[in-house]
Amino acid sequence: MEEFQGYLELDRSQQHDFLYPLIFREYIYALAHDHGLNRSILLDNVGYDNKSSLLIIKRLISRMYQQNHLIISANDSNPPQNWGYNKNLYCQMISEGFAVIVEIPFSLRLVSSLEGTETVKSYNLRSIHSIFPFLEDKFPHLNYGSDVLIPYPIHLEILVQTLRYWAKDPSSLHLLRLFLHDYYNLNSLITPNKSIFSKSNPRLFLLLYNSYVCEYESILLFLRNQSSHLQFTSSWIFFERIHFYEKIKYPVEEVFANDFPAILWFFKDPFMHYVRYQGKSILASKDTPLLMNKWKYYLVNLWQCHFYVWSQPGRIDINQLSKHSLDFLGYLSSIRPNLSVVRSQMLENSFIMDNAMKKFDTLVPIIPLIGSLAKVKFCNALGHPISKSTWADSSDFDIIDRFVRICRNLSHYYSGSSKKKSLYQIKYILRLSCVKTLARKHKSTVRTFLKRLGSKLLEEFFTEEEQILSLIFPRASSTLKRFYRERIWYLDIFCINDLVNHE
């Protein structure tokens, strides 16, 4: 690791091409494997230490520089017999190594900001947990919103060119380009029917995609800041990036130079908000739909003219938040009125006023969750619980533990829901599916099995909060009901574990 730290220090002295030698360091690939950066082929091969060889990696890299090199497809089912090793394993190893190396410049910027030696130029370091307080605080005051699917380039060359600005190392990026073209089927990696966040995509492609998103968001951020405070100190990043894209012959002058004053006018509304999560974003505004339309067409033109990414404006709907719901991070989010009556008395006169307030409402999408449970055989398509036959051979403790873990994860994640009736239905399906699985294992009926165990089995499905409150308030059922209605955002949960992982 001392040698690794030595190479990192080169970036602090503004030396270029310092990443390229790291490609030929064996500890880079060991680091990528040991930390489990991507649960893929590397973690599924038990004999990794015996099969891996830096010599083979160097030979693969050398082949990419040969003019008449042997192109190996990742989907080739009949590899040459003289290779003598798992080509998919080593292609995956190189991909993981590239991901570690290319992330170094981004990590150094973050470390420098934490040490106080440099101010981070990127403003995309906010946690996903800040989204939920933002929605509760800001959304009730907004009127219109759009759920936008962020398009991603259909060709990896666009992603590599975008990365050139952030990682100024031509040698490494040239080798990365050769690797992507030679060892991957570009038509099958990124298609409109396959999300960039699919688990089959390596970490490297997530890094390339995030650099593309960071690039276009930095342009949006610049324009938004310039509308409120025109400061030269923050504009040098933007003009440096314009010069960079002029070098690679992008039509920047067509997008920015001609319409720059008009673009700044688009962003003058202080109530325009932008939220990104995974591959989607939300645009929301308090103003009329006219401003939302301007934002929509500006984003489409930015993607098409600046990044050569096709996007259809007709698929971006502008909805009134009080009448439509947004599918957001597994929730159905909307704004609903909360009516209250206030009685005021002044001397002998009394007044009754209707006070209407907007409230951010989050619901559990019951139909998609039942579909997910039916897909992994916890229930049928109608939501009727069935036994999990593949778990019937496990011990009783393992069966109960698996069901309890899934149930508590879902309860933990959807604790932010304003109405938990749908969540109770999901928990009921899991509980009864667990009982049917145990009854199937012991060759008994559900009724007989429940009589033998009593209520102890169902108590396992209570969350920690429910158990604590049941001990503190054993008879105060109103307290428990009030607790169930409260909305709690847990900061240690940002995604639902895929139910397939529990197989």
Curated annotation (Swiss-Prot):
InterPro entries: Domain_X, Maturase_MatK, Maturase_MatK_N
Pfam families: Intron_maturas2, MatK_N
Residue intervals passing through the bilayer: none
Superkingdom as given in the UniProt entry: Eukaryota
Entry's Gene Ontology cellular component terms: chloroplast
Gene Ontology biological process: mRNA processing; RNA splicing; tRNA processing
Localization of this protein: Plastid, Chloroplast
Keywords: Chloroplast, mRNA processing, Plastid, RNA-binding, tRNA processing
Single GO MF annotation: RNA binding
Major place of residence: plastid
Described function: Usually encoded in the trnK tRNA gene intron. Probably assists in splicing its own and other chloroplast group II introns.
Family: Belongs to the intron maturase 2 family. MatK subfamily.
Protein name: Maturase K
Organism: Purshia tridentata (Antelope bitterbrush)
Gene: matK
